[in-house]
Amino acid sequence: MGIVIGKIELNSEKQIIGELKKKIKGINLNVAQKVIMLSGNVASLKGNTLLKSQEKQILEILQSFKGLYDYTYGLKVEALDKIRRLENVYRYIRVIKGYPIKGRTKSNANTAKRQASPGGNKKLKIMDILKKKPTNRKERRIFNKIKKLQDKHNKQQQKNKKSKKWKTKK
């Protein structure tokens, strides 16, 4: 166990410069070297060879740097994990809805929602369209045409039934 800065634990087996640069946001190689030089330590110093007094010096210097007052803010890993988690949630929702994950939804959503079928079983597609709500323009057109045809067919059947009733009464 090396230096513990807030929630950040620096690896004791690696050089402090590399660990500062890797784990604390806002610290690059030059800043890490300056911090260690200001504390009066050697640049190639490893975490397991540090004394408590040297750790305190490094902590004080880090706190004095502008923009690094709150050194717990500098957790790169946690910050990136939060962002990735939110991105993944957003992407997951978009994938479920059938929308493109990023980009234009006015026209791209139509392409994203199309079902690629080899060969083209149109009858199966039409049956699928009738079972669920249409999701894009093409499906809506087909859905509306089929509905109109069904309505016409139903009207004709009703007319035929009425005419048969009249015929039987005569």
From Swiss-Prot:
Residues 132-147, 155-170 have a biased composition (Basic residues). GO terms for cellular component: mitochondrion; ribonucleoprotein complex; ribosome. This is Small ribosomal subunit protein uS13m. Signal peptide: none annotated. It is found in: Mitochondrion. Belongs to the universal ribosomal protein uS13 family. InterPro entries: Ribosomal_uS13-like_H2TH (IPR010979). The keyword Ribosomal protein applies. Located at the top of the head of the small subunit, it contacts several helices of the small subunit rRNA. It comes from Dictyostelium citrinum (Slime mold). Part of the small ribosomal subunit.
